[in-house]
Structures are given as C-alpha cells and as structure tokens.
C-alpha cells in the first residue's frame, strides 16, 4: 500500500473530505482521471484501474483536482520509483509507472490528440524511438538556494509548481558521471566565499568530456578560482563561469566547447559533429537525438542538389546531416547566437552547401531571401509550433514535410493546416525523449498529394 505526501497545490477551494475513487485513464499530462458527482477529477500520481483515496483540492464547474493520499488497489503497471527524491523533486512525474506502460500511454495520447484536433487518422504508425529509461540525460541545470540564517547553500531541483529547491544527492535520469558529481559539487560550492552570489549549476556530458557551467553574479576571488580549478583537475571536468552579461570564462584553462556526434556508426569521413556554447539549446537525450536525426534523414531521403529548408534549425542538428548527404540546405533560426554557432559548425564539418539565416519565423516571410520553391521542408519548432511559418506553404510547395514536435497539441493544430493544403499524413511516431516524465515528443511525415 503506497503512501504519498506532497505539498498542497494552489487552489480556489480547499475541501477536507477524503474520497475513494476509481481511476479509469490518464490525461495527456500523466494525471489519473476519475469521476465524482458528474465531474472529471484529475489525480496526479494515480494510474488507470486503481482504487485510490484522495482529497479534493480544487473544484471548478466541470472538473476538480485532487491530491493522492493512498493507493488502495494498485495497477499492475505501478512500480516503486527508483529515485529517493521522486515525491519531492519536480523533475520526474511518471516514475511510479512501468516504462512500457509509460510508452503505451504516450503513444495512445499522441494518436488521440492527432485524431481529435487534426482529424489525422491516416498514415502508418512508425515504431516509437526509445532508448534507456534511466541515466539518459546528458545535460541538467541544478538550482541553488542560499540560506542567510544557516549560511548553507543547497543544490538541487525545483519542487513541482514551486520555487523551493529540493536538495538532492543523485539523479536517476541524469548521466551517471554527472549524477556522481552532485554531492562533490554541493560540498565544493559551500566552501567558496562567494557562495551567497552563486546562481544555477549546469552539468553537461559531451563526447569530448564533462562540463560544468556555474552562474555567478559577481567576480570570484583568487582563492575561490583556485578551489574550482583544483576540483576541475581532480574530477577531470571542464568548468566555466557565466556572468551577468552571459559571457563565459574557462576556469584554470581556456574555454573548451562541448561537442556531440549527430550520427551513429559512421566512418570518420561521414561523421557530423556539433559544438555549442553552454548557453545554447541542445537535445538532452543523446541516444534519442541520434535516432531522431537518422529517422528524419530516412523519411526525407535527401538527394544531391535538392533544395531543403530547415526551419527552427538551431545550431544545425538536422541541417548538418542533410548537407552531408549532398542536399542544398537552408537553415533558418530565430536566435542570433545559435545562427552564429550553426555557421561555425558548418565550417568545422567542411560543409559548403549549407546557408544559415537569422529571422523571425512568426513574421511576414514573403521578402526573406530564402523564401521560394523548395523540394522538402523540415520543421523543428519550440512548443508554440510552426503555425505562422506554414502559412507560406503555397509559396514553398515542398513535396515532403517532416515535422519534429515537442508539443502534440501544436503538432495537431499545425497538422490540420498541412492537411487542408493538400498534404497527407504518411508516418507518425512517438519520440520518447524524456522517460519517467509525461512529456511527449513526436515526428510526422507529410507528402503532397495534389
């Protein structure tokens, strides 16, 4: 019999009564769904086919929310969370469900959203892109909190829906070498005279080593720098400091940039690497990112001299491999710093059939120098999606569109636009980028039919 104790969420009305409810399904955010007095009740932590004791925390006209008090009849999918911080840390929210159950739920949720909001029921369901369920994150940002009374600095993750920092000793989804650095780093930071002026700590596992980025709000003195330098040497890690202006400075050595390989099992002549500054966005799951890039290459099937447009291209995660396969690639990104790094990456990989542009992809694109007829289109937008960019489909007329999504809701909305413009959904597949969480990512292939 599992017991759960979590901080009370913000609510419009607190009710003290405890109820016994039967859970029939999960919502798209991973919360259990039950019925009570004609209302849908959302219960984080509950699973389908469970009988649970809950306490209502919020009541609206058509739904209610409840806190899970006790699992009376557990689901066959319920498992014991591996992380000792699971019930307080806000990082993971599905560790109580088997990995196979998580993936089955995510795939069903993806199909449901696409059918309900896009009317997209056609197309072949591609096998889900899956990898390791634990220690898969190659990057994580830990928060710090300095207690003025005890003079102690806590290092950990934010609690769910809170600014409170939960001190942690390990992270079961973080790469093991990075997880093993959490306790030593917490001890080190508490030895610094500037510990009250420290911000977050970012840990990165790259193909060329391990990295730590420490946010500082004022310059460190020589003694603190010496301690950081000694720690870096002892643990064989690159440490750099990020100041208030966003500038980076290496500790004890020149600043080294992390590097990732984008494709697996490639000869050195076919390898594609991506370097980045610590402030840039990169996919945190390296194993899945490689599988995702490979699947995008397979679905787009770039041919030499085809004109392929990569919108929301970042630093070249897809653009670089596309150009390596001989296509004429145009990458467009809204963050200027990432465009600069993308150009650096193109040069480092000796790719000359690749041009990057900086631009606002939610604005009028009609006069952009890259706008015009293309053969194929790749989209990898943020959670807001690519709705504005898709309004220019008629001018671009790509035969194929591969859409990589981190938000099924915006994917469904944008898919409706593609279907209205004469495209057919040919492939749809789950990308399990974040095991142990409710987050759903997906890839879809559309082909022009008229």
From Swiss-Prot:
Question: What Gene Ontology molecular function terms does this protein carry?
Answer: 4 iron, 4 sulfur cluster binding; iron ion binding; RNA binding; rRNA (uridine-C5-)-methyltransferase activity
> Where does this protein hold S-adenosyl-L-methionine?
283, 312, 317, 333, 360, 380
Q: What InterPro entries does this protein map onto?
A: 23S_rRNA_MeTrfase_RlmD (IPR001566), MeTrfase_TrmA_AS (IPR030390), MeTrfase_TrmA_CS (IPR030391), NA-bd_OB-fold (IPR012340), SAM-dependent_MTases_sf (IPR029063), TRAM_dom (IPR002792), U5_MeTrfase_fam (IPR010280)
Q: Please list the GO biological process terms of this entry.
A: rRNA base methylation
Which reactions is this enzyme annotated as catalysing? uridine(1939) in 23S rRNA + S-adenosyl-L-methionine = 5-methyluridine(1939) in 23S rRNA + S-adenosyl-L-homocysteine + H(+)
Q: Where is the TRAM domain?
A: 12-70
Enzyme Commission number(s) = 2.1.1.190
Q: Which CDD domains match?
A: AdoMet_MTases
Q: Which SUPFAM superfamilies match?
A: Nucleic acid-binding proteins, S-adenosyl-L-methionine-dependent methyltransferases
* Disulfide bond positions: none
Cite the active-site annotation.
406
Q: Which residues are recorded as binding [4Fe-4S] cluster?
A: 83, 89, 92, 171
PROSITE patterns in the record: SAM_MT_RNA_M5U (PS51687), TRAM (PS50926), TRMA_1 (PS01230), TRMA_2 (PS01231)
Query: Which UniProt keywords are given for this protein, alphabetically ordered?
Result: 4Fe-4S, Iron, Iron-sulfur, Metal-binding, Methyltransferase, rRNA processing, S-adenosyl-L-methionine, Transferase
Could you say which protein family the record assigns here?
Belongs to the class I-like SAM-binding methyltransferase superfamily. RNA M5U methyltransferase family. RlmD subfamily.
As for what it does, the entry says: Catalyzes the formation of 5-methyl-uridine at position 1939 (m5U1939) in 23S rRNA.
UniProt-recorded name of the protein:
23S rRNA (uracil(1939)-C(5))-methyltransferase RlmD
Q: Which organism is it from?
A: Shewanella baltica (strain OS195)
Q: What is the lineage of its organism?
A: Bacteria, Pseudomonadati, Pseudomonadota, Gammaproteobacteria, Alteromonadales
């Amino acid at each position: 019999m599992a017991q759960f104790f979590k901080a009370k969420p913000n609510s419009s009305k607190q009710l003290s009564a405890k109820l016994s409810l039967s859970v029939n399904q999960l919502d798209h955010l991973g919360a259990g769904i039950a019925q009570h007095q004609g209302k849908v009740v959302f219960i984080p932590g509950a699973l389908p086919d469970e009988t649970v004791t809950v306490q209502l925390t919020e009541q609206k006209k058509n739904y209610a929310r409840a806190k899970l008090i006790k699992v009376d009849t557990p689901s066959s999918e319920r498992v014991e969370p591996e992380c000792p911080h699971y019930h307080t840390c806000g990082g993971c929210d599905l560790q109580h469900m088997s990995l196979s159950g998580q993936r089955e739920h995510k795939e069903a949720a993806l199909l449901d959203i696409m059918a309900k909001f896009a009317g997209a029921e056609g197309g072949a369901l591609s096998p889900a892109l899956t990898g390791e369920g634990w220690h898969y994150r190659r990057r994580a940002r830990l928060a710090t909190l300095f207690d003025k009374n005890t003079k102690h600095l806590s290092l950990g993750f934010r609690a769910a829906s809170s600014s409170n920092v939960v001190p942690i000793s390990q992270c079961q989804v973080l790469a093991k070498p990075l997880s093993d650095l959490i306790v030593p780093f917490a001890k080190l930071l508490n030895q610094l005279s500037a510990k009250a002026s420290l911000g977050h700590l970012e840990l990165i596992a790259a193909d060329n080593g391990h990295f730590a980025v420490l946010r500082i709000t004022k310059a460190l003195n020589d003694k603190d720098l010496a301690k950081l330098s000694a720690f870096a040497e002892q643990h064989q890690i690159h440490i750099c400091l990020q100041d208030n202006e966003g500038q980076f400075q290496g500790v004890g050595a020149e600043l080294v940039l992390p590097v990732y390989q984008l494709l697996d099992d490639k000869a050195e002549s076919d390898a594609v690497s991506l370097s980045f500054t610590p402030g840039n966005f990169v996919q945190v799951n390296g194993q899945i990112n490689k599988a995702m890039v490979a699947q995008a290459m397979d679905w787009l099937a770039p041919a030499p001299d085809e004109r392929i447009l990569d919108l929301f291209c970042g630093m070249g995660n897809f653009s670089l491999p596309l150009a390596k396969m001989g296509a004429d690639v145009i990458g467009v990104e809204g963050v200027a710093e990432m465009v600069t790094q993308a150009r650096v990456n193109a040069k480092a990989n000796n790719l000359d059939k690749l041009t990057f542009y900086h631009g606002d992809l939610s604005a009028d694109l009609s006069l952009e120098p890259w706008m015009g007829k293309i053969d194929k289109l790749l989209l990898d937008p943020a959670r807001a999606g690519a709705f504005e960019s898709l309004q220019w489909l008629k001018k671009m007329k790509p035969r194929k569109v591969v859409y990589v999504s981190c938000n099924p809701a915006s994917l469904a909305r944008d898919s409706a636009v593609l279907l209205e413009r004469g495209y057919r959904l040919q492939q749809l597949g789950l990308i399990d980028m974040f095991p142990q969480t409710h987050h759903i990512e997906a890839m879809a292939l559309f082909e022009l039919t008229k």
